[in-house]
Structure formats: C-alpha cells, structure tokens
C-alpha cells in the first residue's frame, strides 16, 4: 500500500493533520494550542482554516452531508454527525491535490500536455513543473517515469505500471470512486471498459479486483458509512 503523503504538498499534509486532530478532539480547541502543537504562525493558521472551510463546503455539496466548522477566533471546533467518517474529508484533500489529478489525467487519457493541464486548473507552468516533479518522484518507487517530450505520459514496464495504477486506489481507500456517479452502475462499467481497452495487459482478474474495489466504494458513499 502506498503512503498517501507521497503525492501531497507540505500544506496539504498540514491540512490533513489538522483535520485528524480536530476530529479526534471532538471539542473546542484553543487557537494557542494549535499554534503550539504545529508551530504555525497566525498567517498559516488562518490560511489552513480558509482551506478547511472551502473543503467542508465542497464535501457537504458533493457528498450530501452536513459538516461545519465553528471558529470564534479564540477556538475552533469541527462538528459532524457520528456516521460521517473522517476518510470522507481526507479523501477530499487527496482528490483536490494537483499531483493526484495529473496522475488521473495520465491514467484515464493516457496523454496530457502541460498547456492543457495548466489551462484546466488555472495554474502557471512553474506550478505544473513542481506537480510533475512530485509525481515523477512518486513514480520512481514503481520504476516508472514521466515522459515529458511534447505530451506527458507515464512510462514503465507492464508489471510496474499495474502496481502504480493499483496504488492510486489505496491512497485513501477507494479514492477513484467519487469521480464516478454514485448512483449509476453503468458509469462504473464504462470505467472498467476504458481500463480494459486502454491497458490490454490488465488481466481478467485485475479487472474483477478493480470492479470489486469500486463497487464497495460506491456502496460506502451511498450509505455514508465506512466499509473496511
């Protein structure tokens, strides 16, 4: 299983850590405690809280749940129903990562260009270079690499590429699932067909495993409970 943090920036890792701490606390946490614990400056705290607020808004909308943050400047509290797993928030952080989105683009489209990716995500080439370097460092763990000539694509032998592909599913549970319709099994089948046609070296057993992983993910997101 791959370590989630390999695809994240330092700021994204800090956001994950803050979410975990607030979930575990289950009560108001004084701002001074947060600053001491994470050695955050006033600017860092405010920046992270702004990110957390946007993230919560996105999760509430996409997952049809109700999570809220109570911030009175002196303390902060994260309030969520008991049946809302922390994984919902953590997966949202990972899915919002540019490195993760670039990996998905390359897997589902096979090719992408720096120009197209920058325009789609409103970033400049300097940011794209940081993102592609981070992904390349992660790919090296699987003996794969990015081919950066004209159009970006992932290169590597079949066995290593399959290992990398599987790793994306286990970064944060079944993290590809939210990209599909949560109520449409036909959408799930279409995704499996894309993989089957695009990557012929994926075996029948591979495809069955992927379908099982994603079916469990669909069930989990529909019910709002974590399936382990």
Residue ranges and their predicted role:
Residues 2-228:
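A cross-family "folded-core" feature that marks the main globular domain of proteins
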